[in-house]
Amino acid sequence: MILVNTDYISGKEFEMLGLVKGSTIQSKHIGNDIAQSFKTLVGGELKSYNEMMNEARALATKRMVVEAEELGADAIVNIRYASSAIMQGAAEVIAYGTAVKFINK
């Protein structure tokens, strides 16, 4: 599956199959959350939250790809990500794009 954030793939013609998306809501262990809150007092990277967001993006992307495969897509174009805080220590990540099928592979 080809994944791009542009609305084209160089050298490929395709037909659009429709919108595909994947999402997840992730949270961290309460102990990690407390440790990270202390880190905000002194500054620096919040590695635990970085890991959480990376995991969430990967899972949302995987779910989007599964949806595209169910449509028989060869690629997903114009991929975008959005995130929002659901509550302290939890975030929702959404991946979405347009599933396409190549013409004259």
List PLM regions with ranges.
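Detector for methionine-enriched segments
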Residues: 1, 16, 52-53, 64, ...
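N-terminal presequence-like segments and the immediate start of the first folded domain
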Residues: 1-32, 70-74, 93-105
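Short, solvent-exposed loop/turn elements at beta->coil junctions and helix N-caps
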Residues: 6-9, 81-86
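Short, well-ordered alpha-helical segments
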Residues: 20, 25, 33-80
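A generic membrane alpha-helix/interface feature
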Residues: 39-41, 90, 98
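Membrane-proximal amphipathic alpha-helices
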Residues: 86, 91-92
